[in-house]
Amino acid sequence: MPAQIDIKEVHWLLDIVQCIDVGVIVLDRQYQVEVWNSFMENHSGLGPDEVHGKTLFSLFQEIDEAWLKRKVDTVVQLGTRAFSLWEQHPYLMHFKNYQPITGQEDFMYQNVTLLPLAGATGEVEHICVVIYDMTAAATHKKQLAAAQAASRA
């Protein structure tokens, strides 16, 4: 990133974060929500004002707290990204599937990326959680497996 960022570039970046078709959440080290983009609002039904300052675990009881804390601890300690694929862990948050093409799935399959966000001191102070909707890929993989099984029968 350049040393100086023009103010219009900041506006572009904010627009991108809001409009991009992935979930973006920024959490502090106590798992309190600091940033919540429109993808998250649309799929959770919760607006930024409703979630800001609340812990992710209080908002979504279905989150495997021990699992997520282990992943975040690794991100903080190593200062590197961590990933979770839908094949290993189908979802972080149980969102309904709203895709008409893949409507046969009850919930959204998700890939998750955890990014360390360092403060001015260089220490990781926040975590960015990026959620990708993988429902179409999951559905296609299941359909392919079913077709292959049927062809062997």
Regions found by a protein language model. Give the residues of each.
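Sensory modules in modular signal-transduction proteins
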Residues: 4-43
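Amphipathic alpha-helical regulatory segments at dimerization interfaces
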Residues: 62, 71-78, 153
